[in-house]
Swiss-Prot record:
One MF annotation (Gene Ontology) recorded for this entry: cellulase activity
Function per UniProt: Non-functional secreted XEG1-like protein that binds to host Nicotiana benthamiana apoplastic glucanase inhibitor protein GIP2 more tightly than does XEG1, thus it outcompetes XEG1 for GIP2 binding and frees functional XEG1 to support P.parasitica infection. With XEG1, is required to elevate apoplastic sugar during P.parasitica infection.
Originating species: Phytophthora nicotianae (strain INRA-310) (Phytophthora parasitica)
Quaternary structure and interacting proteins, as annotated: Interacts with host apoplastic glucanase inhibitor GIP2.
Recorded consequence of changing T75A: Affects the binding to host GIP2 and relieves GIP2 inhibition of XEG1-induced sugar elevation
Membrane-spanning intervals of the chain: none
Protein name (record): Inactive glycoside hydrolase XLP1
Length: 238
């Protein structure tokens, strides 16, 4: 009985799920991250499903994966399974560094339309609604494209030795900036503050904005037997 009770306590405290989770809004706490399945737009698919799981937590690093098949509405994102950092919200001007690393692989059958991207949101107050969204696309598979007012990049910029095309467009009342890598990056290491510094200098981005959300994951449009495996991910806001 004693060993049984100990096993229950361990199971309750263990931050990593033993199995994949497939429900639309399921999540799993993993160290200083929350791993979301986040099938926010699944109803646009004619068929499909997606499951996500945590593989390992080691210090400030997490390994996780997500698997899916989605059909229909090839211009519509179906989900954004991601690892979200839990952090204290700060104004951009008061942040010293936002170091991050992500190493991943992607497999699929047939044709895939998807991206792999960081997603960061800011607001004029720590608890306010989203005013700006900054996306950093490491990969754009099958012609996936970002939100854009014109369909054309407004600039090409090199940050941390990686080349990105910058797009701008509205998503409701939120202004979206998307840095799309010109070549697929599967092993990424950067200070994300450099992207904000660029926007402050060239796009009149207000440094008084609070960083409220920092996530990294994948947005599938369509795909069959697809799987993204993140072997190592870390992020911090200093």
């Amino acid at each position: 009985m004693k060993s049984f009770l100990i096993a229950i306590v361990i199971a309750v405290l263990l931050p990593v799920s033993a199995a994949d989770f497939c429900a639309q809004w399921r999540l799993s706490k993993a160290g200083k991250y929350i791993i979301y399945n986040n099938l926010w737009n699944q109803n646009t698919a004619t068929s499909g499903s997606q499951c996500t799981g945590v593989d390992k937590v080691s210090g400030s690093t997490v390994a996780w994966h997500t698997s899916y098949s989605w059909a229909g509405a090839p211009t519509q994102v179906k989900s954004y399974s991601n690892a979200a950092l839990v952090f204290t919200k700060k104004q951009i001007k008061n942040i010293k560094t936002i170091p991050t690393t992500m190493k991943y692989s992607y497999s699929y059958s047939g044709t895939l339309i998807a991206d792999v991207a960081y997603d960061l949101f800011t607001s004029s107050t720590a608890s306010g609604s989203n005013e700006y969204e900054i996306m950093i696309w490491l990969a754009a598979y099958g012609g996936a494209g970002p939100i854009s007012s014109t369909g054309k990049a407004i600039a090409t910029v090199t940050i941390n030795s990686n080349s990105f095309k910058l797009y701008k467009g509205p998503n409701g009342s939120t202004t979206v900036y998307s840095f799309v890598a010109t070549k697929t990056i599967t092993n990424f290491s950067a200070d994300l503050l450099d992207f904000f510094t660029y926007l402050v200098k060239t796009q009149a981005f207000p440094s008084s904005q609070y960083l409220t959300t920092l996530e990294a994951g994948t947005e599938p449009f369509t795909g069959s037997n697809a799987k993204m495996t993140v072997s190592s991910y870390s992020a911090a806001v200093n």
